[in-house]
Amino acid sequence: MELTRRQAIRTGLLGAAGLAAGGTLTACGGGSSSGGSAAAMTLWYWSGGLSPSVVTDATKKFASQTKLTSSVIGGDFKQKLLTTMTSRRYVPDITGIKGEDMPAMLPDADRFVDLNTLGAAKLKSQYLSWKWAQGMTTDGKLIGFPIDIGPTAMFYRSDLFAQAGLPTDPTTVAAQMKTWDEYFAAGVELHKAIPKTYLVDNAGDIFTAVVGQSGSRFIDSSGKFVGDQDHIRTAWDTAVKTVTLGIDAKINDNSWNGNIANGTVGSVIGAAWHALDIEQAAPALSGKWRVAATPDGPSDNGGSFLAIPTTCPDPALAFQIITWILNPTNQARGFTDEALFPSTPASYTMSALTSGDKYFGGQKTIEVFGPAAQNIPNQYVAPADSAVSAPYYNQLINVENGTSSDSAWSAAVSQAKQIFAQQGGS
């Protein structure tokens, strides 16, 4: 069974600690072999990473200049890319890089073309500034060109909210559940009225959202571990409240789809791309889900980039292909085809985004996601962020299984510090 994007990100976070000691590229000299040539180019991405129809059109558009061959790579995309780049064989000329993997790629920026040398700066104003910064090194090299972003929102079952006597209109829901405490209070009422239904799918998703709302993560820009400081503890305590209040469904496995479909989960805090996951999990619930603003403000979860390895025989042409695939019009198509929320604000006024979404009762979800996208805090994400954050998610599962919050917190911080040290932190 193919993992949804939310499952893939969760799996990556929970497994990151085990890979903490060996996740970077090894440096090597010239003489690399590439899967492409001046007459042919290869593009790697993962299922759902780009609009297939846009990629097909790119193949046709640039047919007079190159034979563009695209490959949808299954399994562990990052590891397969690292393996081919290290072996210097069959390296793609254009490759996707997942947002959660970009921080680990930035220290090896010399393995990718600096897109600024190809004129990327002239296009910067068309893309969200915080997203643009995520693909840039501290010394100003741009290795990742923005694909999509993951502005968060509250997805909720309007029919279950109505049954519990809660508001159902997205504007009213946002106004009455503008803080986490107000949202959780509504969850208590929901579970009281419908005992089989819980407000959230798991505590980890709440932790992710609250960390994303703060100005800092687990390692600051000076390289200092800050995973034991107040902003992380606040996110932890907020997530744990869902457990202590009895409004957490504690779903951390592949039963997520079934629990979305059977009404166990009454709402989900997730990125824009969760819309497709929910629709695929529960097509029969079309018209019953709605979207409202995230309590206490937006955050980002997911989103990816395209990059050009230095082995590419014609970086200038590769860049032309990338910028065409990711222009505002084609990003709007990506939203229609794959629920890839555009990193280009100009797309937000296009019909692909302004039309009502049938699955969400005809709601114009851009009215929620658009403002969220433009108000996401800019955070520094260290190369070791995924590995260092993994213990917090593992320990939150332990809290869901009965471990005390304080005990699990201490274990999470201790384990995170150990991983930080293994990654070269001090």
Roles of regions detected by a PLM:
Residues 93-96, 266-271:
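Paired acidic/hydrophobic, glycine-rich loop segments that form the ligand-binding mouth/hinge
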Residues 184-188, 222-253:
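Glycine-centered hinge/linker elements that transmit conformational signals in sensory
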Residues 64, 241, 247, 281-342, ...:
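Extracytoplasmic/periplasmic substrate-recognition and gating elements
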Residues 101-106, 272-285:
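A ligand-binding cleft/hinge motif common to bilobed small-molecule-binding domains
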Residues 2-104, 123, 316-317, 329, ...:
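Conserved N-terminal structural module of periplasmic/extracytoplasmic solute-binding proteins
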Residues 98-153, 290, 358, 370-371:
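Hinge/lid segment of periplasmic solute-binding proteins
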Residues 72-81, 100, 176-182, 249-262:
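Short helix-initiation/N-cap motifs at beta->coil->alpha
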Residues 361-416:
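C-terminal capping/gating helix-and-loop segments adjacent to ligand/active sites or protein-protein/ligand interfaces
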